[in-house]
Amino acid sequence: LSDALQKFEDFMAPDSSCLAPLGAEPLEKGIKKFFNPDFVAVVQRPASAYSGFPFIIEMGIAYGGDIKSGGPHVYRYANRIPLLYDEGSDVVLKVVNDTDWGRYKIKGEPPFIIVSHICSTRIPYKTAGKENVADRQEIERELRLALQFLSRKLSSFMSKRGQAEMA
């Protein structure tokens, strides 16, 4: 029975109706209000689960405008609470640092920001201080997919902008 349960892969994901994500529209409005960017894109990934706990990843990317160069600047949130300390060992920063920005035609240190929000019934913090999110495989995968989607949108914007400047 134990072997059969471990091999079974058709378990349904937990219900995500108990989660309260920010939403794509308020996230986009907030980014526009505080950073006045030339480009902004947001995505809300479909609900997923780790260890039986549902979670939703929301992410936004913004470029130009009032954003200082030296990017990417990362803003992390978990259940609507900003994670201000110990960002170096967070799963979000790991995903951002592992991204090959050259693939998306982003060279140097351009002015852009990444805002990530993890909404879950149980955030897997590394420490009792709730300062950073542990790198769980399922959460890392959803963060990576969200960042890849947004990076493609930013790359498309930069290509169109470059063509317009050449003309």
Model feature map: region roles:
Residues A62-A167:
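Charged regulatory segments coupled to nucleotide-binding catalytic modules in large multidomain enzymes
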